[in-house]
Amino acid sequence: MQENNMMNQVSEEEQLIEQAKIRREKLAKLVSEGKNPYEQVKYPVDADSETIKNNFEAYEGKTVALAGRMMSRRIMGKASFSHIADRTGSIQIYVTRQDIGEENYASYKKDYDIGDIFGFKGFVFKTQTGEISIHVTELTLLSKSLLPLPEKYNGLQDKDMKYRLRHLDLIMNKDVRDTFRKRSMILKEIRAYLDGRGYLEVDTPTLLTMEIGADARPFKTHHNALDLDMYMRVETELCLKRLIVGGMDKVYEVGRIFRNEGMDAYHNPEFTTIEMYEAYTDYIGMMDMIEDMYKTVTLKVCGTLDINYQGTEIHMGNWTRLTMAEAVKKYAGVDYNDWATDEDARAAAKSLGVELEHENATKGWVLIELFDAFVEDKLIQPTVIYD
């Protein structure tokens, strides 16, 4: 079985090498014919696939110019159909020998490949099956793809490859591209929200001369010019608080954090945080603002407060606030206020089958461990845990 898998892997690699060789030969042929795609430095674009599809009545019959990557092709003699993916989605194009010329159509059929990038002009119409398409009158090869795209039209299937070859994942998966765009929109709206409330966005140091901040191991480097060991920051908190001390009443930072620790589905050594601090308010005031910010940003980015995340409906308009003790009482059935001593707390944990990390854990630590064991995975809807 293992031998067969190895043979299949070698066969796939040989096929990829052969396909890459063929594509380079096609490129050489195009260059020899004076059609070098890499000499095309720009292509004017005046529309995109999503706008055309969403406003067909306004675009029907009009000439538009688009650019994108060819994701499929159906050749039918003197006419063909392709799907072109641009930054907003995908649209079908209709290409004929009569419209783009015999020589260019011959190249389209024989020398152009799935994955190549084109610029094209044509008029918008609907096919007999009702699909919004573009009848191409001008087709220009802008870039030749020298490596074949993954076999699966619906995207990469190998999770490791998805993360190692993000550019391929973006090419093949529209949902991934949408996630990138939505992340950008979220950050934009968060900034707009905070800026509109008088917050000042700041950049605090990424390289520090000492290990400070959260209980996390930092990445260490060396500054050659100063002959000084330095550390990548593990949080932005302390520097932001110094700005509050310095008289800046409202500050926030969207910052990259680096922690030289383990990795799993919830932890990455490099990630982004948003921290904000405000003078002359309390944690209730910050809770109020954060809840309002989430609702405002969600409505602007998603158009609704009810969103679906991995098959689960999240209702951003309904927030719950619980103290940690209230949450443990609700989900574990034990009341923190009934524990007169640390021994009472440890006995409660034992009765629930929770093995404590520290045998002499105090009431507070027992409460935290019960929260981890019984509460955290049940908090699906927006919930603030405090006190």
Regions found by a protein language model. Give the residues of each.
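Class II aminoacyl-tRNA synthetase-like tRNA-binding/catalytic domains
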Residues: 2-12, 16, 27-33, 37-285, ...
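Metal-assisted phosphate- and nucleotidyl-transfer catalytic regions
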Residues: 212-218, 299-387
